[in-house]
Swiss-Prot record:
It catalyses: Hydrolysis of (1->6)-alpha-D-glucosidic linkages to branches with degrees of polymerization of three or four glucose residues in limit dextrin. It comes from Escherichia coli O127:H6 (strain E2348/69 / EPEC). Removes maltotriose and maltotetraose chains that are attached by 1,6-alpha-linkage to the limit dextrin main chain, generating a debranched limit dextrin. HAMAP family: GlgX. Residues 460-479 are annotated as: Disordered. The record marks 443 as: Transition state stabilizer. GO terms for molecular function: glycogen debranching enzyme activity; hydrolase activity, hydrolyzing O-glycosyl compounds. It is an enzyme of class 3 (hydrolase). This is Glycogen debranching enzyme. The keyword Ribosomal protein does not apply.
Amino acid sequence: MTQLAIGKPTPLGAHYDGQGVNFTLFSAHAERVELCVFDANGQEHRYDLPGHSGDIWHGYLPDARPGLRYGYRVHGPWQPAEGHRFNPAKLLIDPCARQIDGEFKDNPLLHAGHNEPDYRDNAAIAPKCVVVVDHYDWEDDAPPRTPWGSTIIYEAHVKGLTYLHPEIPVEIRGTYKALGHPVMINYLKQLGITALELLPVAQFASEPRLQRMGLSNYWGYNPVAMFALHPAYACSPETALDEFRDAIKALHKAGIEVILDIVLNHSAELDLDGPLFSLRGIDNRSYYWIREDGDYHNWTGCGNTLNLSHPAVVDYASACLRYWVETCHVDGFRFDLAAVMGRTPEFRQDAPLFTAIQNCPVLSQVKLIAEPWDIAPGGYQVGNFPPLFAEWNDHFRDAARRFWLHYDLPLGVFAGRFAASSDVFKRNGRLPSAAINLVTAHDGFTLRDCVCFNHKHNEANGEENRDGTNNNYSNNHGKEGLGGTLDLVERRRDSIHALLTTLLLSQGTPMLLAGDEHGHSQHGNNNAYCQDNQLTWLDWSQASSGLTAFTAALIHLRKRIPALMENRWWEEGDGNVRWLNRYAQPLSTDEWQNGPKQLQILLSDRFLIAINATLEVTEIVLPAGEWHAIPPFAGEDNPVITAVWQGPAHGLCVFQR
């Protein structure tokens, strides 16, 4: 039997050097680590890792080759009250594995036990890691490096974006390959998108509860192997990495960046009754935030919370991020529940992971976007992230919906959100682009559902409609659900136009939810995380070409307005913006606070957004000059010069002089 050499303690994971494979695993509290390799017949062979450098266990297996399947058994104390849950009867996934063979099914053998250990061996059914070798020709690929001020983000799900697309070959629909297909790239280019933000692509598992209900985790926010691509999005699991990189290379050639939504806040091991896949059995005490009674701090709502203040976990997270940038050429990350990244346990801007990212020559150069909250006390941290980060701006989302759909927002608040929420983000040298403006996202109503439903309809999720937020700031315009009279359809269309215009012509970085530009509906489901079906897949055959053209014209218009592209804070008298009332006069303090919802926003002294958010048709006197409405609010030919705009109820128009 081949013996393991000591090998070396870096890098983490399994790495083939042409003659064998070096294996490394972190565990500060383990007493012994066994490497378990499986031959073609499934026969298991065990080797003690002979090297132990600090908290890194390591060994080198001569003659091992790519394709080798492996896992770990980690020996140590079973002391739940102390946070230790070692159980060598359970085969564990390498946290740095690049490929996984097998499925994460709901099976009692994949549990370690709660109060007492479950000593039933699970190697026969446990997923295995696969040793991979990396040879890929990037040709002349280069990151687009789109300036933040020019960035337009499009948030999409890998499968849902293309699974029903009639112009993409059937055999690649819903896959990584489809992202790089010319049809999809041309669509994104024509729309004006500069960055494709993908929901999680790292391998994830469906929660046992969902599996028992016949559902699955669709969004992917339940990670199990952070270095491995989710194989279900590949035409072939063995070629997933190359398929993904082919798509990125094609998108880069078109000038489109790729941003990954990444989950560095919890794992698919869930709470103490959840499955045992990896971290809990490798070093539970180090990887997770543990309470004094040995249970988890559940600051994520998912049962556990990664301890990103622990040096080894910081190294793990940093290595993971560098892997996606260096190996896959991704252009940035959106961090789910990112307040966890700054917990020490209190939130700090100089938390260890933030500092590591700041000091990394690779990670400090890519786009970083935070979802700036978690569910723990002190978890709402909008505006408080380090300067390198942009942040999802929920202030903008709520203000835009309240202004256009609830009619209860003062002009002053609306203007503040339109101006990149400077009261929130203008600090520590940050620029307006730090505000990621959104009206909708994967989490919540789609844009169409915002104007068709007053209440969530999440019954299909199996929780009796208890899940999902009740604070939607939506307006069904008098009838719950899709369809209705011509008048109803037109009023809803006008509201959609108003929300899109507010999003795409405001200061900050706009993010558009895929499908909003052609009227996608989830039929009132505002938490469709477990709906891998036609509820979430974009139906391109039913897309509204008129709405798509309207959205594309707005993005094109945005790129013509210097005040929106220069990424500088607006200052009084700088010529970037003037705020005027319906008579083209500066607003008084009373008008800002209590005035009618009528406003004119003059940008770069040449572009005018006239707003009438009242219930009545209102005459708006435009500023001095020869003004004409411009696309998408008027045709290209024969512009009509006007000095007064008859503003329809809940309407707006953009003019140029």
